[in-house]
Amino acid sequence: MKKMKVNVIMPMLGGGTRMRGIQPTCKPLMKLPDGNLFFLKALKSLKNYNVQTLILVVLKDYFKDFNDVLSEAGRVSGANSVHLIPHEPTSSPVETLRIGFNRLLTSYDVNLPTFVLDCDVYGVIPVFEPMDFEAGRVFYFEDKNPNKSYIRTKGVNDDVVAEIVEKRVISDKAVMGAYLFEDIHLLRKLLEYTSYPFGYISGLIQYAIESENATIGASPAANVTNFGTIEELEQYGK
């Protein structure tokens, strides 16, 4: 199957308070035991995709550090163009996504499907055949950790998201932290709202399902490894 062309936005303006003091840098630039930087390891999840534009929304105080590894981000992702956006911390991942998406609007390939990718998880994101009228897709792995987001699925093939919730176990399908918006017009419409009753990407997707009647697919990712908490980092590679 031919690789799908995609754009990628990595929102990285969180404070990373759970990891503070482990290493003298921000969370995305921390090193894993194998030497990979967090966000570079996460980008390796996209090896089955043809990345066109990569947008990294980063903390202003660490702009120089990110700039020093910008070429590596391009090499790892295979992106045709990489854009670094320094910014002050925001109140939520959705606000950070909006900053990245506004930059994407200046790109010639803005209408391509767009991944929103967390910086603290790795997994092999599979290729898939989109369903009719599919607006997006969520990738998941088997887990029961209450600190994750979870989906409940439906459909003949159990591959349609019926519900997505944050930090509440409603199934054994934990969200990997990779969200694909295939309908860019829908994403733009969602981000044009000025306020939300939620701040997580999962809430944005649930809103799309409930209010826009959007069809969101679900696919299992392989070899998922999380490293966003101290406990997960200690278990990395074991």
Describe each PLM feature range.
Residues 8-14, 29-32:
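A conserved hydrophobic helix/loop-capping motif in glycosyltransferases and polysaccharide synthases
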Residues 15-22:
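Short acidic/His/Gly/Ser-rich catalytic and metal-binding motifs that mark active-site loops
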